[in-house]
């Protein structure tokens, strides 16, 4: 694909002899370039000739080192090829490096993640049943402890380990979860969730003929979503009481990956991923208006690709969080007003609804 016309403008792409994408020019005129070495593996990403990251690889072409501003991230693998350690450190050449974060991972013989060790948030242990379903998680981060049980069809049940079984927490009729730990759900004839009621209030959902969610109504207001022909969300809007949209956020896509978002306050964020085929974020480049300078922010991710910290080019933390098992955050913090909405790979948090 050489050219892609989207609701937010035209993207153009260039490729080398091995069909590796070497450049993408975005509608705002900025160009992201990928440099490869002889075997066709990624060596550098730059934006308008400004280096975003450089990569060093081992004899198997696995990434073992990347630059992220004044920080560098080193990766180590176990004999099975699984990531066992990801250490981020600061330090100039000739200076003893200082560890910024250190993440270590342990696995079972069935490739189940058993333990993570995070230098800033402590240890987290995971427990599974014989079929590989997670049954409990214990973390030193905010003392998080949770457990789960399942029915014979694999549906999550509302009761926790050791909790007395009742009709409400032991049965999932027609494989539709009607209630789960204080949250109640209602469905339409297509099996789509049309209402969710919990301690934080009630949300109602409306869909189009393609089963895409196009509107959410909460106690705080109504929000509307616009899609393109490929089902990619191109815009979200807050709807005023008189039915008019405002506070529009627009989304630009590169294939099925979110490439850029433009927020109502005039700031755009360009997302850069660890390689052309990945959904794991590497960096975000913020820009105010057309003439504003680029501000590069770097993602530091867990083994599953979920962002745990963001740093600026000087290596200072601007955002951080931990995660519960299903993706809810633990003690999210922003330092300096940076909002970060990427979660698990391919997921984007709408803060106005919590979805």
Ranges and model annotations:
Residues 16, 58, 118, 139, ...:
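Acidic/polar residues at beta-strand termini and the immediately following turn/coil
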Residues 94, 124, 244, 340-341:
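Short secondary-structure boundary/hinge segments and terminal tails
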Residues 2-8, 23-29, 43-53, 65-71, ...:
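Beta-turn initiation residues at beta-strand->coil junctions
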Residues 1, 10-20, 31-41, 52-62, ...:
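Aromatic-rich beta-strand edge motifs centered on tyrosine
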Residues 123, 202, 222, 293, ...:
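A generic structural signal for beta-strand entry/edge sites
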Residues 92-99, 141, 241-246, 266, ...:
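Short, solvent-exposed loop/turn segments that connect beta-strands within catalytic domains
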Residues 103, 157-173, 284, 289-355:
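A motif-centric feature for acidic-aromatic and gly/ser/thr-rich catalytic loops and repeats
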